[in-house]
Structure formats: structure tokens, C-alpha cells
Amino acid sequence: MDIVGGQNLRQMWDDLAGVYGDKTALIFESCEGIVRQFSYASLNEEINRTANLFYSLGIRKGDRVALHLDNCPEFIFCWFGLAKIGAIMVPINARLLGEESAWILQNSQVSLLVTSVQFYPMYREIHQDNSTPLNHICLIGEQLPADDGVSHFSQLQARQSATLCYTPALSTDDTAEILFTSGTTSRPKGVVITHYNLRFAGYYSAWQIALRDDDVYMTVMPAFHIDCQCTAAMPAFSAGSTFVLLEKYSARAFWDQVRRYQATVTECIPMMIRTLMVQPAAPTDRQHHLREVMFYLNLSAQEKDAFTERFGVRLLTSYGMTETIVGIIGDRPGDKRRWPSIGRVGFSYEAEIRDDQNRPLPAGEIGEICIKGIPGKTIFKEYYMQPEATAGALEPEGWLHTGDSGYQDEDGYFYFVDRRCNMIKRGGENVSCVELENIISAHPKIQDIVVVGIKDAIRDEAIKAFIVLNEGETLSEAEFFSFCENNMAKFKVPSFMEIRTDLPRNCSGKIIKKNLK
């Protein structure tokens, strides 16, 4: 079933501007409370100016441009501005450090980066090091440095025409984005996302939450994540709704923001729900317009009941991952919800539970959750420049192996059991154990290392490192945590460390992690 009808992202925005005109498309609120607002027509003009900016800097169809930004309107301008000229966005997690970010630039062969002043010192070093193809940086902010190879985004954009000056032929099969996601290997994989993927995500996610043009969808999710893009921004714009993007999450400010913007839909991860619940109760707790709260794993029944009772909202569970583009299994507004089920499979997809031999399992038996879609349309196209990884995850017939375990009941409701092997879920971020182990093992005093996830009341899982030191060495906690903080993003830094004389292993030498939790 083709619900996109050959419409690429350039056509989408031109149509939206014509249909909705002066209707509010985007509201952005910064951490300082500064609000910027754009209609559909004015947002399309900002997107066109940004597309022309990229063209003036030599970007053409198929070129890759990286964005390292916190939530801001410029992210939206760049995302769709690049798509309009057939270029490819490479969003970088705003919390990554230099080595991690440089690897993505190198792997995706990015020559142009858009970032903000706060991240510039890191990229100045990368630029001067000449270890990546990066040759130009476009900066957002005030008091910009007068360095070679650096330009001022706002000044350049303001000079551009609001009419698109470069319109190469586009297909819905063209790549719009390469989104690097943590995997079970030591390095992230680039998930290739097409124009069709994004257009489909808009229609699908709007259907999932019955979104209309009088809805207001508010999110605090980071724009560089798939959930912000494909379960919030794309459905909001596709339905002609108003999209409210907050720069950062604040438990103290959240409900005031919900009321201020009269949000009807929002999305939460467990960490948000837990921090909202520890805020002092107020008479205004139920005074809002929310009809749905999109929710992503993992929460106990007691936590769910306490949250819904206190705030008078319903949680709409959705299960997916970057590779599935959207929440391919989930609740639906009009359906009965069967907690702790993650819901039923959505339209355009099939789902099965399979055993270790890739055979379908009957209801009630636990196995791997496998999803069938169309690569490049309803699921990701491929892993960028990694054909072996693509073949390992994606069967020729379109079946995607998620690596997650679960089961389904007789009525077709699915239940999530466990996370991907070697992955830790920490406050909405996926952290690769192997990646951390490789970084920490570089410490000269450490002989052996393994990291595991342990239960955390707020952030789902905390990270604990078990280490074996070289003979005769000592290592303080301060020294260990300082090393980690200097070599990885903050959200990847372990919360705990324990020194051991050895690590439990099986007969093949593999560490038995269950003996360490």
C-alpha cells in the first residue's frame, strides 16, 4: 500500500505552505524562556533560505552535511533545507565528544558541519587536525570567531532568497538522512533513511495518535533522535498541527509548558515520568488539554497507574527503533489497552516471534521480535557502507531482526521481555557495552573490563564497570571516573565501578554477565 504517492519532502513543504499558510507550524522555547514562532508559510521560507545557503556553500544533491545542535529552529531549517536540494543530513548526538563525533564525520565523509558556538572548540580541533574531510563549519550563535573555514549561519541565511534556486530532480527513494545509532559493535551504524521513509513516518504516526490539524504536539525529545523526527515532527507537520519544540527537558517547567501551549499530545520516556512524579503535587496537576502521552519502554504497572491517576492522562505505548523508523507495534487511541502489552502491529507491517533457528513461534512462547516491512519505505533502507551488517539484520524478503525478545498472546498483542544483547538503556539513550569496554580498556592500569546495566529508579538502567587491574596497580574512583569523563559522552560514563581480581567466564572465554548483576 503506497500512502506517500511519490511526494518527496520538497513537495511536502511547498504543499503545506500553500494549504496552511499563516497557521502556526512551529513554536520553539529556549531554556531561557525565549520563544520563536513560525507559520507554515514563513517556516517554508526559512527552509528555502537555508537550502539556498547550503547551495551557496557548494552543497549539491547527494552531499552529506552534519548537524551537531541542541534543539533549535535551525535544526528544522537545515533538516528540510538539505532535503529540498537532495542533500543528506547527518545528525550527531549533541552529547558526543570529539573522538566520537570525528568518527562519524569520517565515516560519512562530511565536508560541511552546522553547529553552535558551544560546540565549536571541539570542532576547531577536529578541523585543524585534518583527520576528517571536514573543511567548513557554519556556526549558529553570537560572538563568532574570525577563523578560516568558518561562516555565520544567521548572516548567510538572511542574505538568501526565500525562493528555492536549486531544484534537482528528486525521488522518494533518495536518501534524506544518515542517522548513526548505537549498536552491539564498538562503533555506531549509519541508518539510511529515505524521503519515502520520512513521508511515511508522518502519515503513519499521525494515524497512530489520530492527529488532526487542531492538535498541538509538544516534545522535549532531542531533534537528532528518530523519535523526535518521526513520531513527533513529521506527524505534526504532515497533519497540519502545531509542533512545539522545547530546547531541554525540565521536570519543574514541564506541566506549565503543557498548559501554556495547550498541548494535546506529548511523548515521555520513563525517566521523565519518574522525575515528574517526584515534583510536589499541585492543584493544577490535571488542568491541561493532553489527550495522549506517547510512551516508550520501560515502566512498572504501579508507576504507570500512579502517573495516569495523578495527572489524568493515558499512556499510548509505542515500540520501535531507528531501523523501523516509527513505532511499528503500539496502542491505538480507540482500542482497549492491555498493559503491559506494547500493543499490536500497525498497518503496512507484519510481526512475528521467532526462535533461534528463525522459525515462527506460537502464542505465549518467548523469542526474537521480527518485523516485516519494505526497505527504504516502511523500514530503513540499509546501514551506510556496511553491507554485512545490513545482511545480518535484514532478510531479502524484508524481515528485520530486532534482537529484542518478546512474545505475543492469542489476540495478537505483543509483550516486550528484554533488550538487545549488550545494550544498556539509560534515560532514553542506547549505550553499547562493547564501545565503553573498548574505551576503558585503553587505560594503562586496566587489564580487563566489562560493563553491565543495573536497575535505576529514574533512568531505567545505570552503568556499572567491573575491572581487573594490571598486577601491582592501584586505581582510585576519582581517577577512573575522570578518565571516562574525558573520553566519552557524559551519558555513557559509568555510575559505579568495582575492582575485582578476575571476571567470571564460560568455557569459551566469554564473560558471564548475569553473574555480575
From Swiss-Prot:
Keywords: Ligase
SUPFAM superfamilies: Acetyl-CoA synthetase-like (SSF56801)
EC numbers for this chain: 6.2.1.48
Enzyme class: ligase
Catalytic activity: 4-(trimethylamino)butanoate + ATP + CoA = 4-(trimethylamino)butanoyl-CoA + AMP + diphosphate; crotonobetaine + ATP + CoA = crotonobetainyl-CoA + AMP + diphosphate; (R)-carnitine + ATP + CoA = (R)-carnitinyl-CoA + AMP + diphosphate
A single MF term (Gene Ontology): crotonobetaine-CoA ligase activity
Classification via PROSITE patterns: AMP_BINDING
Pathway: Amine and polyamine metabolism; carnitine metabolism
Single GO biological process annotation from the record: carnitine metabolic process
Keyword Nucleus set for record: no
Gene3D superfamilies: 3.30.300.30, N-terminal domain of ligase-like
InterPro entries, sorted: AMP-bd_C, AMP-bd_C_sf, AMP-binding_CS, AMP-dep_synth/lig_dom, ANL_N_sf, CaiC
Keyword presence, Phosphoprotein: no
Any single Pfam family the record assigns to this protein: AMP-binding
Family: Belongs to the ATP-dependent AMP-binding enzyme family.
Chain's role: Catalyzes the transfer of CoA to carnitine, generating the initial carnitinyl-CoA needed for the CaiB reaction cycle. Also has activity toward crotonobetaine and gamma-butyrobetaine.
Official protein name in the record: Crotonobetaine/carnitine--CoA ligase
Source species of the chain: Salmonella paratyphi C (strain RKS4594)
